[in-house]
Regions:
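Active-site helix-to-loop segments that bind/position phosphate- or nucleotide-bearing substrates
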Residues: 1-183
């Protein structure tokens, strides 16, 4: 399993490295300058955390917000199906971690990425679209969050239909289902 995680990590690095060639278009930066690195899609990794969390770049803030919306949809679908969200197969099991939710999000991430990428390529941003926290993290202004939430309509029903299919498959293999059903 560790080898699979390593392959996934390398693939993600290559995937998001390709995003770095994409320019971002800005207006109003004469009055309110932005960091130089905001003119192109940056590294997926945050300089604050060394992970994808605590985004310091607008595109990462967009992705994090969109993934948060996806996580909510998948979590609702998992719980509604009567599955234990903490028992996953790819993401390691840790206290408080919803490993099954993260596992089931993986095949849906490309749809989120596509929506965000399409938005980034068509949108002209302004510095007011984002808010910098005292710690240096980049967050979405509420209006920008509304744009991202509108992208959610495209994926909202998908987690429920996929998890319904998984539940049917698990019912066909009762022993496997008993491993991941909530107690």
């Amino acid at each position: 399993m560790e080898a699979l995680r390593l392959i996934e990590g390398r693939a993600a690095l290559a995937y998001f490295t390709a995003w770095q060639a994409i320019p971002l278009w800005w207006k109003g930066i004469g009055k309110r300058p932005i960091p130089d690195e905001w003119h192109r899609v940056g590294l997926r990794q945050s300089s604050l955390s060394g992970t994808n969390r605590h985004a310091t770049h607008p595109v990462n803030a967009l992705l994090n917000y969109a993934y948060g919306l996806l996580e909510t949809e998948v979590r609702i679908a998992v719980v509604a199906a009567g599955l234990d969200p903490t028992i996953g197969y790819l993401h390691a099991r840790r206290p408080g971690r919803v490993a099954l939710v993260y596992d089931l999000m993986e095949p849906l991430r490309p749809r989120v990425d596509h929506g965000v990428l399409e938005f980034v390529q068509k949108h002209i941003f302004s510095p007011g679209d984002f808010v910098m926290t005292n710690s240096g993290a980049c967050r979405l202004h509420s209006q920008m969050a509304g744009f991202v939430a509108a992208l959610r309509a495209d994926i909202e029903k998908t987690p429920r239909s996929i998890i319904s299919l998984i539940t049917v498959l698990l019912d066909d293999h009762h022993n496997l289902r008993t491993l991941i059903v909530q107690h």
